[in-house]
Amino acid sequence: MAVFPSSGLPRCLLTLILLQLPKLDSAPFDVIGPPEPILAVVGEDAELPCRLSPNASAEHLELRWFRKKVSPAVLVHRDGREQEAEQMPEYRGRATLVQDGIAKGRVALRIRGVRVSDDGEYTCFFREDGSYEEALVHLKVAALGSDPHISMQVQENGEICLECTSVGWYPEPQVQWRTSKGEKFPSTSESRNPDEEGLFTVAASVIIRDTSAKNVSCYIQNLLLGQEKKVEISIPASSLPRLTPWIVAVAVILMVLGLLTIGSIFFTWRLYNERPRERRNEFSSKERLLEELKWKKATLHAVDVTLDPDTAHPHLFLYEDSKSVRLEDSRQKLPEKTERFDSWPCVLGRETFTSGRHYWEVEVGDRTDWAIGVCRENVMKKGFDPMTPENGFWAVELYGNGYWALTPLRTPLPLAGPPRRVGIFLDYESGDISFYNMNDGSDIYTFSNVTFSGPLRPFFCLWSSGKKPLTICPIADGPERVTVIANAQDLSKEIPLSPMGEDSAPRDADTLHSKLIPTQPSQGAP
């Protein structure tokens, strides 16, 4: 069994994905990591050790270090060498294997020039034939920032404002103010903002009202490293000005003039802003009209898609209607087939597309962790090839709390809200694959100008188990009735997108009518 030296999140998903062989027997060894997290300083090197128990040579084993996903990995060592093609781009040239003790089962992952993004959990994974074991190793990253600096500003009311600043801290530091007698007092305001590298810039302000205060110190502490930096400032008595009547009079006059100026600017803004707002609303309305037209034209090419059980991963359970699928912890005993996925928990649709336009919808509901789209019929189904267009996958996914297009560097998708149903439109000749949020018909993402070679098939993948299935929506009975605008670029005239044959009474513009209807999956899975 695997040894987990420190507590962590459930790793059910990673364990399921790693079951890529028909039968994984219990390994004749354990994998043991360090009992405590490894502490590393930004810019320095870190080593994450793990070992086999009992001691045995690991030269003939596959060794894989990975983070949240098995592939791409931080480092893969197989057949006596490192597999750079399977390595995450951010670790290329930085992550190497320390194998001085590999003959005794002792190895370590060395990360050069540690970054803030390296902080977190790593999995040390050993595999021999059909057996594997793993252990978790936690890396904690820290950085001691610059020497703090205090700036002083004397306000008109006689109070003194001090601001203490410093850069380059990780994790977020603590700020503490002290008097010359060691008395502590809190900040009036604090801010901690990360830069592009994840290092925090801290700024803390305090108001000094006690004129007896002579010296004030600012301490910035990194609790993880147990270190702090300090700066002290002396407050001269001459810094406390006296308020005279003429200063008060000037302040009142300036305040009145400021209020009059603000009122004048606001009135002018209100006067000239009404017309541009109307134009923006008109442009936004036409933009929504174009999106609705694009989606409705796509539904004219709706096809009936069903799931192909011969391609389904053994942990995927298909419903009787071949329209719904869910991921389970248990593994089915299925016949070995070349077309079956044995590593990624995926399944293909039965339908094959070699030309034309095709549209279908998938009910994702409120389940998390999925990927859907289109792939080549001959994609690699054995092993952990990355799901990218270069490998024949064109898909979008929900993973963790984010939506992504599965491009080589994974493109984040800033959606207005989580889609409960996703429409997929394939235009083979144009080389376009579009995804729509069927909550409102808006675009999610489009792969454009792709040169397809060979048959394409619908593609579905689940990253986490649960009772809620992924469901393909069936085609509604009867002919589809959608009005198509002859010239979609000419929106100078308001052309309603109402169903043909109905009256032209106004309808709720936010209500979308699809050629596909939702389905309730069967109560039981096969």
Swiss-Prot record:
N-glycosylated. Pfam families: C2-set_3 (PF22705), PRY (PF13765), SPRY (PF00622), V-set (PF07686). Keywords: Disulfide bond, Glycoprotein, Immunoglobulin domain, Membrane, Repeat, Secreted, Signal, Transmembrane, Transmembrane helix. Residues 517-526 have a biased composition (Polar residues). Residues 504-513 have a biased composition (Basic and acidic residues). Residues 495-526 are annotated as: Disordered. GO terms for biological process: regulation of cytokine production; T cell receptor signaling pathway. One of its GO terms (molecular function) is signaling receptor binding. It comes from the Eukaryota. Residues 285-479 form the B30.2/SPRY domain. The chain crosses the membrane at residues 243-269. Residues 27-138, 148-234 form the Ig-like V-type domain. One of its GO terms (cellular component) is external side of plasma membrane. Residues 1-26 form the signal peptide. Residues 270-526 are cytoplasmic. It is found in: Membrane; Secreted. May function in the secretion of milk-fat droplets. May act as a specific membrane-associated receptor for the association of cytoplasmic droplets with the apical plasma membrane. Inhibits the proliferation of CD4 and CD8 T-cells activated by anti-CD3 antibodies, T-cell metabolism and IL2 and IFNG secretion. Belongs to the immunoglobulin superfamily. BTN/MOG family. This is Butyrophilin subfamily 1 member A1. It comes from Homo sapiens. The lineage of its organism: Eukaryota, Metazoa, Chordata, Craniata, Vertebrata. The gene is BTN1A1.
